[in-house]
């Protein structure tokens, strides 16, 4: 938790994992909005993942991942046209997305960071440096 905002991290990176995540989110009581920060490797079924969890998300943010298999937030955004995340802001990396979303969120909201082990590792680094 950061300033009254629940932060959830999930390494799932396929539609099956996203469906399980959506089911879990649906059973958790929370008072506010749900923000999602999503970053995924270029070889993943990003549209299938977003579609599976979309019903649980109020606001989206996309982030880029470095590395040979990574992709920029803009490339991810292009692959998500027509999805619930089509209007999401793009952030250079997970750390900048975490900062931006936590600045926007209010106590009682929850922030989900998901899409890859790389995404969660970058989020953990950002969260630890923010404390």
Name these PLM-found stretches:
Residues 29-30, 81-85, 131:
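Short helix-capping segments at alpha-helix termini
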